[in-house]
């Protein structure tokens, strides 16, 4: 249902602002992969913002592996990349060669230029500070936004409950999921 909600939001006239809540291993990342793929099919770039370098690389591997059979270019940006690699990624992002970029705070830096950003995915929003969120607000005026969290902060949850933000709750694990 969360995937259907996101798809419907992305096809509506107003920009999506949806919170997807679900326990660890319930499929939030899969919802994000599908949303980013839909954005790429619509010739829009997607940015996946994560709080740590390790998570950036894990998500990069997941997105890359899930989309390897499609003409979608996935890359990542974090402090683990060399200056040369970072420069190349930033150039490719600006020229539109990268469809899906996954990264840490580096994604909201002044030197990041987008070709046509259409979707912003924020994983674990509660781990980002106020200044990061302010930069995100400036970045996402006409961009679909998907926030994923297993433990949303009260303010985020309140916005969803008030109706200022849409919310999908993943209550059941995917079939064949092994317990963690």
Put a short name on every predicted segment.
Residues 1-47:
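Pre-Walker A segment
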Residues 21, 102-103, 121-122:
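Hydrophobic residues in beta-strands of the RecA-like P-loop NTPase core, especially within AAA+ ATPase
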Residues 23, 51, 150:
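P-loop (Walker A) phosphate-binding loop of NTP-binding proteins
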Residues 39-47, 68-69, 142-144, 165-169:
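Post-Walker A helix-loop "phosphate-sensing" segment adjacent to the P-loop in P-loop NTPases
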Residues 45-55:
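Conserved RecA-like ASCE P-loop NTPase motor core of nucleic-acid helicases/translocases
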Residues 55-94:
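Conserved helix-turn-beta segment of the N-terminal RecA-like "Helicase ATP-binding" lobe
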Residues 57, 114-119, 124-180:
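Post-DEXD/H (motif II) to motif III coupling segment of the RecA-like Helicase ATP-binding lobe
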Residues 80-101, 109-117:
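Conserved motor-coupling elements within RecA-like helicase/translocase cores
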